[in-house]
């Protein structure tokens, strides 16, 4: 079967933003204008098409990234048909994992900002994540009809706060209730939207006299930005003093794909003024799958090789080409009440037909692909095949987790994995009735499979089930989903902070010896280990996990016992050395020891290594670390003193303050343990007028009174 749409006419894009910048409404309008949805859903009446989980509709925030396939021929039917796969991403800090995993599989992004509040904390997080994956993007400043909206002020904030170069290709005509449309700086025409067809079409007129000078100023800024794309364009510009519309688009496109600039447009999705031009900008400036670098991967045999030891020759590439071996990345798992598990994949290369088998190269397991569907929010169309560049959902996968690779069994590859943050908050859950115990286990297992930033474990001492996640809202919603989707009522304990431990000494040599010899077969394990504190980067982030090396010479400890020593260290790291919390990172080198011909075995060496690791509390300068959150509070000036005093009482460090449309923005770093229930406190302090957001920043040493309490608790 041939391709319906040439791959150079694919656009895989995400719509990212801060909560309430109007992202879901923008996605709704995209569905409407691309002809998929005949009734526009409004978020505030709980009817938006992409917000298809019950809680999303109730809370008015987007939680899961729904992937939608649409087609676009241009606001003036000026293009051949393009296939646009849109992923709607959540903007709430507790769901950054959803944003991260969507950005991983996208080729370009539309970042939506509110015309009034501009660059908000979460926008910075999303921007950093897009930088991390090198995602080219365009900016859409929405809500231009709102009080205090100002397009060029937001453009300035993007430059100053995000350190990127925005290039407006429009300016706004009017603002707030007088917002009428845009000046198209490429055509130098004023654009006014037709209310009769809900802003599907527009008329072009001359630019209003009072905006001509401003339009000329920003046009020359745009033309210069385009000219800098190449020597050829620069020479043309210097000779002729201007560039044609084609040259401007080509220059801006080249620089956007290189992530040097960000084209900026404005509008009001709610008032139906501007979204078709956002779609035009997606076609004009964002990349096709063939215009981004080929994805890299490694052969499954090299899966255990440490990243720092990898050589260029260890990597393999997959290009966006139907003739290459099939490879795809599972970026989301969702449970559907009718068909079971949906595995959302981004296909990077090759072709897959339903009924064929693929291999999950991470687990080494074969999977048969039953049915395949293309999603339109929560409706689905069955398809017979997927090709390079496609985003689709596979039905019938038995054992696939987010971030794993599905590929051709004859040409296996493990594509670059996603990094998932460690949870920072835990609560105990127990079913309200004994009968729900088993159901709760199944429900939590399914939710953990869908969301890698959510963990479930059983506390060995208390037998309680502990769930961990990225914030209070994250866990609230998962407990809520358990109730709605699996009919499991649960009681929730008090939130617990995920403390960590580390050591501070840079080189300490410790002996571990485990000997039991009393007639018959005994136990003998003896090793010397040099422990060092983990590496810390400029921002205070600690290298996680164990970096283990073997420097034993002369066979004083036989080779077959070395993995047992590593295992013993790793197991003790999980249980901590000071107060029972996991060691965040450690460097360990085994360099000496001894063995017994008869009594030595793996278990003895594992215990010896564990005993050596335990001594780090005293000998290695063991410390307890607490998670520190980056907190941003937006408050009217009247309540600023109270808010700051309260943050100080919570052991917060004020990092800075600035003015915003809604008052003052206070930025601080506060220990997570002091932030429980903050939502209620900050509301009562400000009579409901202050809002805040927080995200994980780093781990830092906990004060001695907290450590004492934790050690006491451990008994």
UniProtKB/Swiss-Prot annotation:
GO cellular component: cytoplasm
Binding positions (GTP): 17-24, 88-92, 142-145
Coiled-coil blocks: none
Single Gene Ontology MF annotation: GTP binding
GO BP field: ribosome disassembly
CDD domains to which the protein is assigned, alphabetical: EF-G, EFG_III, EFG_mtEFG1_IV, EFG_mtEFG_C, EFG_mtEFG_II
Keywords from the named record: Cytoplasm, Elongation factor, GTP-binding, Nucleotide-binding, Protein biosynthesis
Residue intervals of the tr-type G domain: 8-290
Keyword Protein biosynthesis: yes
Residues spanning the signal sequence: none
InterPro entries: EFG_II, EFG_III, EFG_III/V, EFG_IV, EFG_V, EFG_V-like, EFTu-like_2, G_TR_CS
PROSITE patterns in alphabetical order: G_TR_1, G_TR_2
Domain of life per record: Bacteria
Pfam families recorded: EFG_C, EFG_III, EFG_IV, GTP_EFTU, GTP_EFTU_D2
Functional description taken from the UniProt entry: Catalyzes the GTP-dependent ribosomal translocation step during translation elongation. During this step, the ribosome changes from the pre-translocational (PRE) to the post-translocational (POST) state as the newly formed A-site-bound peptidyl-tRNA and P-site-bound deacylated tRNA move to the P and E sites, respectively. Catalyzes the coordinated movement of the two tRNA molecules, the mRNA and conformational changes in the ribosome.
Family: Belongs to the TRAFAC class translation factor GTPase superfamily. Classic translation factor GTPase family. EF-G/EF-2 subfamily.
Name recorded for this polypeptide: Elongation factor G
Species of provenance: Ectopseudomonas mendocina (strain ymp)
